[in-house]
Amino acid sequence: MKKKLLVVINNRANYARIKSVLIEASKSKKLNLICVIASSGMLDKYGNVEKMMIKDGLNVSHKIYTIVEGENPTTMAKSTALLIMELSSIFSKEKPDIVFTVADRHETIATAIAGSYMNILVAHSQGGEVTGSIDENVRHAITKFSSIHLTSLEEYSKRIIQMGEDPSTV
C-alpha cells in the first residue's frame, strides 16, 4: 500500500526549493502525493503557485486561503491560527502518513503544530539554520514539533542534535 505524503506549499520560494522532490514523489510507486497550497502561495500578487505546479505537471489536491491582510505581528498570528484550523480539517480527511513542510514562516509552524497534535509524522526541511531574525525562533520551534529533519549542511544537523533531537531522525 502506498504511503500518503502530504506536502504543504506556502509560497513561491518554498515551491522552488522542493519542486524537484515533488516531481519525483509524484512518479513514485511507493508514495501517494497530496499537495496543499496555502497562504501567499494562493495569491497572484505573490506569484500564484498553483499555476506553476499545474505547468510542472503536478496535481493540487487542496487550496487554502488564510492570509489576513496587514503584514504585522497580529495578522501573522491570526493567519497562523486560521491555517492550523484549515490544515487540521484536511489532515483529518486525508489521513496522511507524513506531512512535509519547508523553512520557517508562520505557515510552516502552523503545519507542524497541526500535524503534531494529530499524531502525524512531520518532516521539516531547513531546520537548524541560524539567521538572527524572528524566523530563527519559529524555525527552532518547528524543529521541536517535527519527527524527521532534513538539513542542507552538517552544521545544521549537529545543531538539531544539540537541541535534543534523536540523531537517527536527522
Task: Locate predicted features.
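Helix N-cap/beta->alpha junction signal
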Residues: N11, D104, S152-E154
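Active-site-proximal region of nucleotide-activated glycan assembly enzymes
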Residues: I120-V170
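An aromatic- and histidine-rich active-site surface loop
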Residues: F100-Y117
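N-terminal subdomain of nucleotide-sugar transferases
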Residues: M1-G41
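Short N-terminal targeting/anchoring amphipathic segment
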Residues: S89-R105
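Conserved nucleotide-sugar phosphate-binding/catalytic loop shared by glycosyltransferases and other
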Residues: L33-S79, E86
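Structural motif
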Residues: V8, V36, T101-A103, S125
